[in-house]
Structure formats: C-alpha cells, structure tokens
Amino acid sequence: ATIGPDLSHRRTIVAQVLRTQIVREAVRDEMKARNLSRRDALKVARGYAYEIAANYSHPFVVFMSGVLGRLWNRLYDGVELANFSSLESVEDGAEVIYAPCHRSHMDYLLLSYVVYHKGFAVPHIAAGINLNMPVIGSFLRRGGAFFLRRSFSGNALYTAVFMKYFGLMMARGHSIEYFIEGGRSRTGRLMQPKTGMLAMTVRSYLREPTRPVVFVPVYFGYERLVEG
C-alpha cells in the first residue's frame, strides 16, 4: 500500500500552521479583542491546532487493516466494490477528495480499509469534535482523522487555524475525506448535502492551486447497519 506524501510529525505540521500569515494576523486580532499577550494568544492558537490535527501512524494503519479484515467477514458477507476503476484512472499528483454519503460509523473505517488494500494512500478524514473522546479520539487520529467543531461562528482564530491546516493538507497532496451530508443519516436515507467543507476546498485550491483537485463520490450500501 502507498504511504502517501511526506507524513511529517504532528508537531511539525502545527508549527507550520502557526507560522502562516493568516494565522499570525488572526493571533494579532485575538490579542486586541481579548487583551491577551502574544504568548497567551499563540497558546490559544496552538491549542486549536492540536485539537484539530491528525496524528497519522502507518504502522497503526497496517495493524488495523488486519483487524478490520476479520471484522468485515464477521459482521457482513465480505466487501464488494463497484466502479473502483474511476479512482484508479485519476492522474498521478492530483489532490483526491473523497465525498461519501454517511450511513454508519463503519463508513470511514471501510473506505480507509478499501483504499489501503488497493494500494492508495489512506485519506485524512474530517471528523466531528464529538468523536474526540478519550481513547477513541487518539485511535481515530492515528488512522488519519482530524477534528472540526460543528460551528466556527464567532471564533476567527479557530477559523484561521482550521482553514490553514486544511489548506496545508491539500497543498501537501494528502487525500482528504469528508461526509458531504455533514452528519450521519439516522434513517439510512441520503440527506441533503451541505456546502461548508466543499466551499473550504474550493477556497483552499484558489489560494494555492498547486495540483488538480478530483472529487470522488462514494456510496456505502450495507446488508444491515450495526447502529440498528
């Protein structure tokens, strides 16, 4: 399987985000708005960056691929793929954005498992902050998850840090996965798509068009949902 682009240490990524102009300007605005010292405002920004950033571990992904292979055969009658050739035909060097429907918590595990076994880099996955729980949050980060809050409203510093982290992932060529519906369907039916992450993807590309962007829609169909 492909490891993908340079997987710098999480601390390195955070440091790169904090050095960018957009974040430095947001830090200055935070200092003025909350009457903070530069050190304290930077501490807030750094906290946001660590809250967001993935902590991808390739050995962990290799281990989990074996665990998940056994899990699929236990829960389901195997895994069937359709139209995977559309991904295989994507040109080398393109930025791949997986945009799946979201019917089960198994979705992101299944997509990572499939692309890994097909020889592609495991995507970085946008996950809701509600999943950043003790143990589970660390588990997901090591599999490539990065976390976002449900609302960015009223927090310009958090917005700047998240947008720059997301843009940096794109510029570095990491494939990214986000659920276009915004959340998990509780009924199993497809929901109306939301445009927040899509708009952020377009803005990031327009600011730094280093490579073509290819959107890959993904549909999951299950014999039964483990959530009931």
Regions found by a protein language model. Give the residues of each.
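Membrane-interfacial terminal anchoring regions of lipid-handling membrane enzymes
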Residues: 1-228
